[in-house]
Amino acid sequence: MAKEIKFSEETRRALEAGVNKLADTVKVTLGPKGRNVILDKKFGSPLITNDGVTIAKEIELEDRFENMGAQLVKEVATKTNDVAGDGTTTATVLAQAIIREGLKNVTAGANPILLRKGIQKAVTVAVEELKNQSRIVETQEAISQVASISAGDEEVGKLIAEAMEIVGKDGVITVEESQTMNTELDAVEGMQFDRGFVSAYMVTDVDKMEAVLNDPYILITDKKISNIQELLPVLEQIVQQGKKLLIIAEDVEGEALSTLVVNKLRGTFDVVAVKAPGFGDRRKEMLQDIAILTGAQVISEELGYDLKEADLSMLGRASSVKVTKESTTIVDGSGDKKAIEDRVTQIKHQVEQTTSDFDREKLMERLAKLAGGVAVVKVGAATEVELKERKLRIEDALNATRAAVEEGIVAGGGTAFVSVIPAIGTLIESLEGEVKLGAQIVKKALEEPLRQIAINAGLEGAVIVQNVVNSEAETGFDALNEKYVNMIEAGIVDPTKVSRSALQNAASIASTFLTTEAAVADLPEKEDAGMPGMGGGMPGMM
């Protein structure tokens, strides 16, 4: 296929146009007075959201070169979402600012490679300074503040803080849709492990790519299943009962897998197979944990059990199981409470006895899964459109809270970025030439999140930024109440991990963007011309 090639300034301008189209769409959502964006959907009602990464993922531009620019910034939002789960709009705003300031310098003749070096040096200093300012999150109130700021809703903040209190920081919190108009918290004992379905054909919800089994039987074995004959006796009993089945095995492959998939697609029975978590002896222990939680018996030749002889009494039960590509969550297993308590006590004893940090960490993980359980935040709303919007906000708040517990918090509302500017100023004094220009680009870009929050609140961004720069440490602008306050004391905080990831990812993509000198894109295919037109009418008769 023929290609179209653009060079130097023409390339950069086309790419920047794409960056701006995406970033300008996303950045209207930043801050407490940020607006929402409505996204058209092929099926169902449109989605209204303020989630940066959800908006970015929807944007595809017609111009191929502009689209390349947009996709680069989309990568910033996606990567930040993957690492921290929140801060995607902030990351997009920072990337746009670094690209804008950087292109001014490149156009003026600066060397982009040296600019990139300066950007990287400044980001390293900024990240270090953010970590120095970070405060550990310990109280339920601090957790509530982080969640409230992210979701823009105090009630949600309290719910998430309560959920963290119930399951502990190592527990599992999921977000589901409620059948009522209220948003409430439901804590259920459960377990999550990092193994997903062995075949994508087993999903029950194609949009979310997940399989949900309500009230299933659970078969647990430490052997590889490749022959369907081994499973037939127990499968026949399950089909007669009309129940669903979760298989946890070393692997399910070959004839066994294809037969299960075909029968699932035909609707004969509902089955999901997942690989057993862990390796070696740890796998045996984890399978035993799951068995105790669900009231099952691990079918293992070591214990004298054969898969062919398995019956329903050896299978576990749970109220529901959710399996995604990467994880399996078992909720409300029907195991004996006393047996679960004994197992928890046994693991605690092992934690005390072990001298290996790695073993201790793995034992604590198992303990959290057995004792911590699963908290479910059930999101309610009057309409489906509002429900989806609220659900996205709560998922963001949950991610922000986890990030805060992990790495601590800094002053929110863009204040933390402004507060690291003096440290970059010190760095700039030690640099020279175009490397110095690169550091200055970051220094200016760090003002952008605060400026955008002020603009979205209908205020003059430059004035607000200047006032905060000249204020004491941790003093920032409360855009909701339009006043200057100590952000930490006012509970306006951001997770350090979110701020750090946003800056690192924005700088990574933006600095690489500046080094671009040529772009290659497919030429649009030309439509085949139709048959040439025939002359109308009959030839004249003599």
Swiss-Prot record:
Binding site for ATP: 29-32, 86-90, 413, 478-480, 494
Keyword tags: ATP-binding, Chaperone, Cytoplasm, Isomerase, Nucleotide-binding
Subcellular location(s) per record: Cytoplasm
GO molecular function terms attached to this record: ATP binding; ATP-dependent protein folding chaperone; isomerase activity; unfolded protein binding
GO biological process: one example: protein refolding
Leading EC class: isomerase
SUPFAM superfamilies with a match to the protein in the record: GroEL apical domain-like, GroEL equatorial domain-like, GroEL-intermediate domain like
InterPro entries found in the cross-reference section: Chaperonin_Cpn60_CS, Cpn60/GroEL, Cpn60/GroEL/TCP-1, GroEL-like_apical_dom_sf, GROEL-like_equatorial_sf, TCP-1-like_intermed_sf
Reaction catalysed by this enzyme: ATP + H2O + a folded polypeptide = ADP + phosphate + an unfolded polypeptide
Its EC number(s): 5.6.1.7
GO cellular component: cytoplasm
Superkingdom of the source species: Bacteria
Subunit record text: Forms a cylinder of 14 subunits composed of two heptameric rings stacked back-to-back. Interacts with the co-chaperonin GroES.
Function as written in the Swiss-Prot or TrEMBL entry: Together with its co-chaperonin GroES, plays an essential role in assisting protein folding. The GroEL-GroES system forms a nano-cage that allows encapsulation of the non-native substrate proteins and provides a physical environment optimized to promote and accelerate protein folding.
Stored HAMAP family: CH60 (MF_00600)
Family per record: Belongs to the chaperonin (HSP60) family.
Name the record gives this protein: Chaperonin GroEL
Gene responsible for this protein: groEL
